[in-house]
Regions:
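Short consensus segments that form the blades of beta-propeller domains
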Residues: 73, 101-104, 261-263
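Generic structural signal for well-ordered beta-strand positions
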Residues: 26, 50, 66, 92, ...
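Secreted, short cysteine-rich peptides and small extracellular cysteine-rich domains stabilized by multiple disulfide
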Residues: 293-346
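A motif-centric feature for acidic-aromatic and gly/ser/thr-rich catalytic loops and repeats
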Residues: 40, 133, 137-151, 157-234, ...
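Short, low-complexity export/processing leader segments characterized by acidic and small residues
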Residues: 202-206, 235-245, 249-295
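Beta-turn initiation residues at beta-strand->coil junctions
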Residues: 14, 45, 50-55, 61, ...
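Short, exposed coil/turn segments at beta-strand boundaries within extracellular/luminal domains
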Residues: 18-27
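Aromatic-rich beta-strand edge motifs centered on tyrosine
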Residues: 2-17, 31-33, 38-46, 55-64, ...
Length: 353
C-alpha cells in the first residue's frame, strides 16, 4: 500500500475458521479508506475542523456542524450528510445523500422529535417526506439512577423500529460503561443485535438484523454510519481519530483546565476526547470532561489522611472506583463514570470494620 501521494482504498478479506469435521469457513471482504500520509487537518478561526484526508466539514455561526461531505476516494464512495437545528441548538433533521452518476441522491431524510425536558434526547424519528413514524424510543433512569444525571447514558430502555426486516420492539442491554451491547427482540426473546467497541468507541463489530437500524450505540449516543461520527448533544466526536471535531463550547472550563494541565507539565488539547484517556475520564454531553472519581471520598481521604497529597488521594480514588465494580460491599453509594458511567457501591478503607 502506497498512500504517500494520495489516499487509497484497501481491500481487506477476513477469514473465519471453525475447526470441525469438516471445518466451517466464512469470509467477508470489505474496503477501508486510508488517508494520505501525512494527513493534513485544516481548522477555521474558531477551531472547528473544516477538512481532513477524507471529509469536508461545514459549520454555522454557532459552531454547530451542518454538513459533512466526501472530498477523497472514488466517486462511487462519495457521501454527504446534513443537519438542521432549532433555536435551542437541538438537532431537528438529518439528510443523507450518495453520489450517483454525478447527482446527489437522498437515501434517508428524517426529522428528530426531542424530549421537551431533556436537551437533545430523541423520542421519535419521522420520515421528512410524509411524517410517518420511522423509529421511537422509550427512556428511563440512566446510570446515575436519575433521569438525566449521566446525560442519558445507559437510559434507553427500548426502541421500536416501524419497518424493515428488524421491525418491532427491541429491549436494550448495556455493558458496564453504558454502551449499548445487545438488543433483544421483545417478540421472540432472541438477540437481534450485538455491538463491540474499541477503547475510544470505535466500532469493532456490528452483527444481527437490527444492528444498523439502531442508531444509539457508544455511550448511548447517536451514531451516523456514513461518516462514523458519534453525535453528542453539543459536539460531534470521531472515534476513528479519538478527537472532537470542534473545541469545547464551555470556554471558561476549558481555559481553567488548560492552565491546570500546563502547570502539571501536560498540554491539554481542547478537541481531545476525555484528555486522551477514556478509561479515567468521561464526557456525557460533549461539553467538558471530568475525572473518574468519587469527590466525597477524595475529600475524606484528604481530611482523614493529611499526610497524603491531593494527587495521591485522587490516585487512590481512581483505584477504589475501578475496584468497586467488582467489590459490591455495603456502604456509601456513589456514581462514577468511565467514558460514560458505571454505578458502584463501596466503603472507604478507614470506615471498614
Amino acid at each position: 500500500m502506497n498512500n504517500a501521494t494520495g489516499s487509497v482504498w484497501v481491500v481487506i478479506t477476513n477469514l473465519r475458521v471453525v475447526r470441525g469435521n469438516p471445518d466451517r469457513l466464512q469470509s467477508e471482504t470489505r474496503s477501508a479508506f486510508v488517508a494520505q500520509t501525512p494527513e493534513l487537518l485544516i481548522h477555521d478561526a474558531d477551531g472547528n475542523l473544516v477538512r481532513d484526508g477524507r471529509w469536508m466539514y461545514s459549520w454555522d455561526a454557532e459552531n454547530r456542524l451542518t454538513r459533512v461531505m466526501s472530498v477523497a476516494g472514488p466517486l462511487s464512495s462519495f457521501r454527504r450528510v446534513e443537519w438542521k437545528y432549532d433555536a435551542w441548538g437541538r438537532r431537528t433533521r438529518q439528510t443523507s445523500y450518495v453520489l450517483s452518476n454525478g447527482v446527489w441522491q437522498v437515501v434517508e431524510d428524517v426529522k428528530f422529535v426531542s424530549d421537551p425536558v431533556f436537551f437533545g434526547r430523541h423520542v421519535a424519528e419521522l420520515n421528512a417526506t410524509n411524517n410517518s413514524l420511522v423509529r421511537s424510543y422509550v427512556w428511563g433512569l440512566d446510570l446515575s439512577g436519575t433521569l438525566d444525571g449521566a446525560g442519558g447514558v445507559g437510559g434507553l430502555l427500548w426502541l421500536t423500529i416501524n419497518s424493515g426486516p428488524s421491525a418491532g420492539t427491541h429491549f436494550v442491554c448495556y455493558d458496564g460503561n453504558g454502551n449499548v451491547w445487545t438488543l433483544v427482540s421483545a417478540t421472540t426473546g432472541t438477540e437481534s443485535a450485538r455491538y463491540e467497541y474499541g477503547p475510544f468507541g470505535e466500532p469493532l463489530r456490528l452483527s444481527g438484523p437490527a444492528a444498523r437500524s439502531n442508531p444509539f450505540r457508544f455511550s448511548t449516543k447517536r451514531a451516523e454510519d456514513f461518516t462514523a461520527l458519534v453525535l453528542y448533544e453539543y459536539r460531534a466526536y470521531s472515534p476513528t481519530s479519538g478527537r472532537w471535531l470542534s473545541r469545547d463550547p464551555v470556554g471558561e472550563r476549558s481555559f481553567k483546565e488548560l492552565l491546570r494541565s500546563q502547570r502539571g507539565g501536560a498540554v491539554l488539547d481542547e478537541v481531545a476526547f476525555c484528555r486522551n484517556d477514556a478509561v479515567r475520564h468521561y464526557d456525557v454531553l460533549g461539553l467538558a470532561w471530568d475525572v473518574v472519581k468519587c469527590q466525597s471520598w477524595c475529600d475524606e481521604v484528604v481530611r482523614y489522611c493529611n499526610f497524603w497529597s491531593r494527587k495521591r488521594a485522587l490516585e487512590w480514588c481512581y483505584t477504589c472506583c475501578l475496584d468497586a465494580m467488582e467489590d459490591k460491599a455495603q456502604g456509601k453509594a456513589c456514581v462514577v463514570a468511565t467514558a460514560t458511567a458505571c454505578l458502584c457501591v463501596r466503603k472507604p478503607p478507614w470506615k471498614r470494620k
